[in-house]
Amino acid sequence: MTMMKRCAYFRLLSALMPMAVAAVLMTACATTAETRERRAAEQQRIAQAVEEIVASGDFTVEMNYVNPQRMRSKMLTGEYGVTVKGDSIDSYLPFFGRVYRAEFGIQTGLRFEDKIAQRQVKRARKDYYEVDLVVKRHMEHLFYSFDIYDNGKVTLMVRSDNRDTMHFSGDLVIE
């Protein structure tokens, strides 16, 4: 290739390079905008599903993490969770901590099925609901306080008059 052809080639390349870069950037921005719109639509769909589930009063939460009062946070392995259906609760949660007054022969953690004595549901802020439940079991009252966020994430605080407080986090089961 002669020097003259090489110079013409580089001039052509330098003239086309900004257009190629602009085309790539425009494609990337269009893809990003499309992805952003798709993500917003998915978030809206999940928020709508969460609203319907909370309004129905029947929900299942799968727990991923536990934060005991006297220990470090732990990732939960296994099928831990809580199911609320009508006026009953099915709790399958571990308990780590101090028990102040225990029944003899019953070492089940927070694993039980029972009736809900009280229920209160409210929209706390624009991005989450508070669902508070009271369960009266044998010698203790358990207070389950769920914060159910529009993105399907859930935090749960379990308080008792006979045990340390436990905090859990997990995901709302959306079918």
For each predicted feature, which ranges?
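N-terminal secretory signal peptides
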Residues: 35, 40-101
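Helix-rich interaction surfaces within compact, conserved domain-sized segments
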Residues: 115-175
